[in-house]
């Protein structure tokens, strides 16, 4: 999850549904151990919501605060989803969630072969020298995991984005 350092509300864009109460987005609470400042960086937070029966669910995640003035010209990664739920032992391939990467004045989009092809040069494929994926997901164990996608430009600028993966029974 990424928010501008100028963001007023770190729950904006977050929603919650419950089988008993329906939409409980207005009951989402944010907690954190270390104070969140207006300094760009990564912060560990927990989003939680409760239904009227008192059942509480929590989602611990990393939130990135960024300075919009520093975003110009940096590589960008777009995922098809940013939060997914998997069942125990369900197959998972992190590359399946990559939609688009913009790096070095080139846009790469997912092709029919699931590779990222340059829009302006179909024969050019985004390689591992520019894109790395850190995948700690163990679908054999319940938990909340974060897959980190990082792209690096020829000038050495990097950008990362996270996919939150919840593995449940």
Segments the model singles out, each with a brief description of its role:
Residues 1-23, 71-122:
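Solvent-exposed, low-complexity, repeat-rich "mucin-like" stalks and linkers
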Residues 19-66, 104-168:
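Serine/threonine-rich, repeat-prone extracellular segments and beta-strand-based repeat modules
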Residues 67-74, 169:
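Low-complexity, Pro/Thr/Ser/Gly/Ala-rich linker/spacer regions in secreted
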